[in-house]
């Protein structure tokens, strides 16, 4: 005979099979009993499979296997006489619906006892009424009440009926129960004894239908006619024989918790088969309906339709047609606009923290507490022992001559007129936004439209950007259009002294050429040397401080020589090389020549080097001066020409050992200088008054006004126009602004000639001093201020300050009034301020900028001691030490101060050390594609264009590209969108982006790809942008800040407060990241972080071990511990070991005997004579 263990084993297999489709084993155990019930009422495996599909998407093979297991269990149950309650995992009767497994804590409310005995009286009256009717109604009510209270812990909801339970009802055999009493539970014994006690009295019948009589008595304990509350007998019970029960009918009186299904008889069923089919469909629908609320696999599953089996094709067609009619029909333009707005709304919700970005984990335990503290402790290598990072105070190198002078004080205060106008515009804007009816219900009725919508429609029209050829045509004068290139050359002042100049060049290795702007020294010197044959021994190189100048001059010289650009004459700038094997005249930026010196220390391929515009004293120019001075001592056959204005030519001559100076006479007209009688407190107000006074009282002639920046220029133009409109019958005036961030097509307007009878006024920055020449200028208004970028080595930030100009700048500005005729220069400061409060020359860039890249280049050139390098103007010592320390922290220098392998790779990229390290580290993380895109975007000016009249629309367009956790990723996002739109100019205009700047970034990216291919660095891409943020942290960990308070950050190492700019993607978030890194820190009105990315503190400790260590404190309900992640012990040990090794080497070197070597005299070879010398 089969054992009870086999039945348990089969039931366990059934549970294991169901576990594959359930979320947990408990759910499978609960489902197993329901599946057994379905199997008992199923006549075939197909019917069982259809019923099983309501619990989940079971496969057909698994359904057949489950059906076989259920039949085996049912067979064992029949043979062993084990009830379903006795099966494993079942403590009571299994029913569908909600089952309370643990009800020990639930107890029914005890009936309140009446103090007046009314409850006893009510029971007696009910008993009397039942005796009159001949029925024991009271006993039935009491039994129901007792059973409902006693079985409260077995509360079960109604289970959907089995479609076959009415037609199939297995009877239990008494013999099977008696033979296996050892397996019976207490409940089974109680029910068996009750059944035995009732069988003798309740199953006796004259016609032999004992079972039917029993069921009638048990199912109809009450009369079908009962009185209602009004005493009549119209209330009837439904025929209880129509009740449906399952196969495991619990014999006994009904309780108030029994599951009853009322079936109402149909009026006229067609046939018994139709009724059976209808009952099966109803049972199936009931099961689908109830199971739809189960939490197994259908909760939240909106795709599954439990009534799909009963739908007809016509129903589905009607439903699809109805859904299609409900859809909102949109045009293609409206659909694109709706999609764009949806993306913006989703981005805003993610940014504000209302919704989560996809793929972010949010699982955490409420009982878990984790705190991470970032500890800061700077380490220093031994080669910097004794070096004072702050040996000089920050104020030693200042941009003003006298901090207490009137010019310095007014520069710090700024313009009061501009400040008041800014505040007034903000108040006006807020008031108009508050009182605007556009977009409201009343505004819609009145037909008012939002001005931003109209601006948006106007902004969709692409703006045509003028090319260089178009701009050059606009700049052509009548003289240039009527004269040939030969005649134009002969008209220049430099052509008149051609022979004398060549004679001095032949006799001297170094020559300082002094000439005013427009004398022709830039374009003619290289042609003079070419015509004299210097190109036969090597190329003639000409350096320019700006790349635009190098490109334009090369184009002009190639046109004058009648050759194609890139053949005989070419140019080379960073990330762009337009030269060929036949190029003999090469124009380039000074940085390009500095990079070439890394490959060729002696510059062998050049015979003559011309350093143009050296008076601007750029950083690379000063470094080249020191390098060329050494090259000249090693090569006697190379010549150096340094062109400069009259301002500091003597300093260049002294640096090169008293080199001769050659002056090219200028062709400028006399300029009268007019100083102010008293200092002016507001330079914008004074400039506006002076322009109006010139326009109303002076003869014809255009006006040039020098201002500090974009905001001052725009305010000056608006105020001049407003005040001129207040005058009656005032002469016409054309007001044109120009600054670096203005689009090229708008910049070209200043070169257009004004209409007859109209005076032109140009308001510009110091870009109009040397870079641009505007014809027709007769009056110059000099405010005496400019914006200068200063580097604070103690804080490691660049500050953009409004500072007084130098005397050399003032003379250069005044000279702009005498290009076409006599002019007047109005200086809005006193003559004493010019003499006492201004420097003679502008502060060199090498003394006010970060020198990390410069030091890296010098180390690559073999300069061991940076302090011993021959600088024309020595940079501050603290700046040099800070640059060396930064390179050591980045891994470019070792503990001895020598270049590492990483540092050599970094020096090959023409960019800042941090950006170079980004590309190198990206190879290890396989994200070079994304990193070089970010680096190229960081290497160009801002790509955003924000016109003052459409500022809000520009800001809204910028927000569409925001990435909540990173501004670096925002730049990557912009470039990728531009790339997907085919590098379209119209797309850039629509989204307020500089197409020219983006194209420049694309060229830089292509050049980086070529450099990487030479270094054998592969291009790879990743989809996880967290990896990109991790790589960014590896290069910018020294520029990190942590959150403090609300909306404020502090620098981790210096403790200086930092702020997010309003244009940052992180600004306006619903939360502030704890730790961020930034690209640069700019000090204007506040300390603003530019290009910010949120990072993890563990990343900072991983890559910046010289600065940071992480202390983690963890607590939950089971454990608590503190952990510290730090690489400081290993770094300290390595620094100490290297310090001891260096000390031993120095001691051994000092103890070595000095060996005297015989000096050998080497006779220098005379330089070769070239034809024409």
From Swiss-Prot:
Biased composition, class Basic and acidic residues, residue ranges: 153-165, 175-191, 234-248, 270-279
Reactions this protein catalyses: ATP + H2O = ADP + phosphate + H(+)
EC number(s) per entry: 3.6.4.13
Similarity comment text for this entry: Belongs to the DEAD box helicase family. DEAH subfamily. PRP16 sub-subfamily.
Name of the protein described by the UniProt record: Pre-mRNA-splicing factor ATP-dependent RNA helicase prp16
Motif DEAH box: positions: 612-615
Residue ranges of every copy of the Helicase ATP-binding domain listed in the record: 502-665
Record bears the keyword Nucleotide-binding: yes
Residue positions binding ATP: 515-522
GO biological process, one term: mRNA splicing, via spliceosome
Keywords associated with the record: ATP-binding, Helicase, Hydrolase, mRNA processing, mRNA splicing, Nucleotide-binding, Nucleus
Function: Probable ATP-binding RNA helicase involved in pre-mRNA splicing.
Main location class: nucleus
Species, as recorded: Schizosaccharomyces pombe (strain 972 / ATCC 24843) (Fission yeast)
Region of interest: Disordered: 152-253, 260-279, 442-479, 1146-1173
Domain of life assignment: Eukaryota
Feature: compositional bias, Basic residues: 1156-1173
GO cellular component, one term: spliceosomal complex
Residue ranges of every copy of the Helicase C-terminal domain listed in the record: 687-862
Compartments (UniProt record): Nucleus
Compositional bias of kind Low complexity: 193-209
GO terms of molecular function: 3'-5' RNA helicase activity; ATP binding; ATP hydrolysis activity; RNA binding
């Amino acid at each position: 005979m089969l054992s009870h263990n086999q039945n348990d084993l089969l039931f366990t297999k059934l549970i294991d099979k169901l576990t594959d489709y359930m979320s947990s084993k408990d759910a499978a155990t609960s489902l197993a009993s329901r599946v057994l019930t379905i199997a008992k009422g199923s006549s075939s495996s197909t019917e069982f499979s259809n019923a099983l599909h309501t619990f989940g998407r079971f496969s057909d093979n698994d359904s057949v296997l489950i059906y076989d297991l259920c039949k085996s269990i049912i067979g064992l149950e029949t043979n062993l006489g084990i009830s379903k309650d006795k099966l494993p995992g079942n403590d009571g009767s299994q029913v569908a619906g909600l089952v309370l497994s643990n009800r020990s804590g639930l107890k029914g409310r005890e009936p309140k006892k009446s103090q007046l005995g009314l409850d006893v009286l009510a029971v007696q009256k009910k008993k009397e009424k039942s005796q009159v009717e001949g029925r024991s109604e009271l006993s039935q009510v009491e039994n129901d009440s007792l059973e409902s209270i006693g079985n409260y812990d077995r509360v079960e909801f109604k289970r959907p009926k089995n479609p076959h339970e009415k037609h199939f009802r297995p009877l239990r055999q008494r013999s099977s129960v008696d033979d296996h009493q050892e397996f019976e539970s207490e409940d089974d014994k109680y029910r068996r004894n009750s059944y035995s006690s009732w069988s003798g009295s309740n199953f006796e019948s004259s016609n032999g239908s004992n079972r039917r009589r029993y069921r009638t008595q048990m199912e109809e304990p009450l009369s079908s006619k009962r009185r209602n509350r009004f005493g009549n007998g119209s209330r009837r019970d439904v025929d209880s024989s129509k009740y449906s029960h399952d196969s495991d009918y619990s014999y006994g009186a009904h309780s108030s918790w029994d599951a009853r299904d009322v079936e109402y008889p149909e009026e006229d069923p067609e046939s018994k088969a139709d009724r059976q089919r209808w009952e099966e469909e109803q049972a199936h629908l009931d099961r689908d309906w109830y199971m739809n609320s189960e939490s197994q696999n259908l909760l939240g599953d909106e795709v599954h339709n439990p009534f799909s089996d009963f739908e007809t094709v016509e129903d589905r067609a009607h439903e699809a047609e109805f859904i299609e009619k409900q859809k909102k029909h949109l045009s293609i333009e409206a659909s694109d606009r709706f999609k764009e707005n949806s993306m913006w709304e989703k981005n805003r919700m993610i940014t504000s923290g209302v919704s989560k970005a996809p793929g972010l984990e949010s699982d955490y335990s409420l009982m878990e507490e984790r705190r991470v503290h970032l500890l800061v402790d700077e380490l220093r290598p031994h080669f910097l022992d004794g070096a004072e990072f702050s040996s000089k105070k920050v104020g030693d190198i200042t941009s003003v001559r006298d901090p207490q002078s009137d010019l310095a004080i007014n520069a710090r205060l700024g313009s009061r007129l501009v400040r008041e106008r800014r505040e007034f515009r903000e108040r006006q804007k807020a008031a108009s936004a508050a009182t605007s009816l556009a977009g409201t219900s009343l505004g819609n009725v009145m037909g008012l439209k939002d001005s931003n919508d109209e601006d948006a429609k106007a902004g969709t029209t692409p703006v045509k950007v003028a090319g260089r050829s178009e701009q050059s045509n606009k700049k052509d004068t009548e003289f240039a259009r009527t004269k040939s290139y030969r005649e134009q050359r002969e008209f220049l002042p430099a052509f008149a002294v051609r022979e004398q100049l060549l004679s001095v060049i032949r006799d001297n290795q170094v020559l300082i050429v002094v000439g005013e702007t427009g004398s022709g020294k830039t374009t003619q010197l290289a042609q003079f040397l070419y015509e004299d044959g210097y190109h036969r021994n090597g190329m003639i190189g000409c350096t320019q401080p700006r790349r635009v100048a190098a490109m334009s001059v090369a184009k002009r010289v190639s046109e004058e020589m009648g050759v194609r650009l890139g053949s005989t004459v070419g140019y080379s700038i960073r990330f762009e090389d337009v030269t060929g094997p036949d190029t003999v005249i090469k124009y380039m930026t000074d940085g390009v020549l500095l990079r070439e010196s890394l490959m060729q220390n002696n510059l062998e391929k050049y015979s003559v080097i011309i350093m143009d515009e050296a008076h601007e004293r750029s950083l690379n120019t000063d470094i080249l001066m020191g390098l060329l001075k050494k090259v000249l001592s090693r090569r006697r056959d190379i010549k150096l020409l340094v062109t400069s204005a009259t301002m500091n030519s003597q300093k260049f001559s002294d640096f090169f050992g008293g080199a001769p100076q050659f002056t090219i006479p200028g062709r400028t007209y006399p300029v009268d200088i007019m100083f102010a009688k008293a200092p002016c407190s507001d330079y914008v107000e004074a400039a506006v008054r002076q322009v109006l006074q010139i326009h109303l009282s002076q003869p014809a002639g255009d006006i040039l006004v020098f201002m500090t920046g974009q905001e001052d220029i725009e305010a000056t133009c608006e105020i001049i126009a407003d005040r001129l409109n207040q005058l009656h019958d005032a002469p016409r005036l054309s007001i044109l602004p120009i600054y670096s961030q203005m689009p090229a097509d708008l910049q070209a307007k200043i070169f257009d000639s004004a209409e007859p009878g109209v005076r032109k006024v140009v308001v510009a920055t110091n870009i109009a001093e040397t870079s641009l020449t505007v014809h027709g200028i007769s009056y110059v208004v000099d405010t005496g201020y400019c914006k200068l970028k200063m580097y604070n080595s103690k804080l490691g930030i660049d500050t953009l300050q409004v500072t007084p100009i130098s005397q050399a700048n003032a003379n250069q500005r005044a000279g702009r009034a005498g290009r076409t005729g006599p002019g007047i220069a109005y200086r809005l400061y006193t003559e004493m301020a010019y003499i006492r409060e201004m420097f003679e020359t502008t502060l060199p860039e090498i003394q006010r900028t970060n020198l990390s890249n410069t030091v890296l280049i010098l180390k690559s050139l073999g300069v061991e001691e940076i302090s011993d390098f021959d600088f024309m103007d020595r940079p501050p010592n603290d700046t040099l030490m800070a640059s060396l320390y930064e390179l050591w922290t980045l891994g470019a220098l070792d503990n001895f101060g020598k270049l590492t392998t990483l540092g050599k790779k970094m020096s090959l990229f023409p960019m800042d050390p941090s950006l170079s390290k980004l590309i190198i580290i990206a190879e290890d993380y396989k994200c070079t594609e994304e990193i070089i895109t970010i680096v190229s975007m960081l290497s160009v000016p801002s790509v955003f264009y924000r016109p003052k009249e459409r500022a809000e629309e520009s800001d809204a367009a910028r927000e569409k590209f925001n990435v909540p956790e990173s501004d670096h990723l925002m730049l990557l996002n912009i470039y990728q969108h531009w790339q997907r739109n085919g590098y379209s100019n119209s797309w850039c205009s629509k989204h307020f982006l500089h197409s020219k700047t983006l194209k420049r970034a694309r060229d830089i990216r292509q050049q980086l790809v070529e450099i990487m291919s030479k270094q054998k660095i592969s291009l790879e891409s990743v989809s996880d942008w967290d990896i990109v943020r991790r790589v960014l942290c590896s290069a910018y960990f020294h520029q990190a800040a942590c959150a403090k308070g609300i909306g404020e950050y502090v620098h981790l190492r210096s403790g200086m407060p930092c702020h997010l700019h309003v244009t940052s993607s992180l600004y306006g978030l619903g939360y502030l990241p704890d730790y961020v890194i930034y690209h640069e820190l700019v000090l204007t009105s506040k300390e603003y972080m530019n290009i910010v990315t949120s990072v993890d503190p563990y990343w900072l400790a991983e890559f910046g071990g010289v600065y940071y260590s992480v202390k983690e404190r963890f607590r939950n309900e089971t454990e608590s511990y503190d952990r510290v992640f730090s690489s400081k012990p290993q770094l300290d040990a390595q620094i100490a070991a290297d310090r001891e090794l260096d000390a031993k080497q120095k001691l051994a070197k000092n103890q070595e005997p000095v060996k005297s070597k015989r000096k050998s005299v080497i006779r220098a070879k005379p330089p070769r004579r070239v034809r024409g010398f």
